[in-house]
């Protein structure tokens, strides 16, 4: 049997880390992953996939991940259940074994500041040039 998930998407919110009662770090995040096809309205639909990270992985994502960060996640699919008001509820999520942030700091800063990557209209006066 083989259980492997690999996905690339964007974080929907800033990941928040919490400590368990036994002092283990855990971070939960949601990754928006675009589907390969467009919906009936002509727009690309997305799936919102819950991800769980533990330990150093959780601490690292909480420190460096931001809303909108492009991320690659490797892990395995897990289902857990709990009882509430006599009803059994199931939660399916990815238990991450590794992740990689796929944007440089400058790309992230441009995205966060809504700056386009196209600088063709940029005009500098001669006295503004650093050389």
UniProtKB/Swiss-Prot annotation:
Subunit structure: Homotetramer.
A molecular function GO annotation: single-stranded DNA binding
Superkingdom field: Bacteria
Signal peptide: none
PROSITE patterns noted in UniProt: SSB
GO biological process terms on file: DNA recombination; DNA repair; DNA replication
Gene: ssb2
UniProt keyword list: DNA damage, DNA recombination, DNA repair, DNA replication, DNA-binding
One GO cellular component, as annotated: nucleoid
Protein name: Single-stranded DNA-binding protein 2
Annotated coiled-coil segments of the chain: none
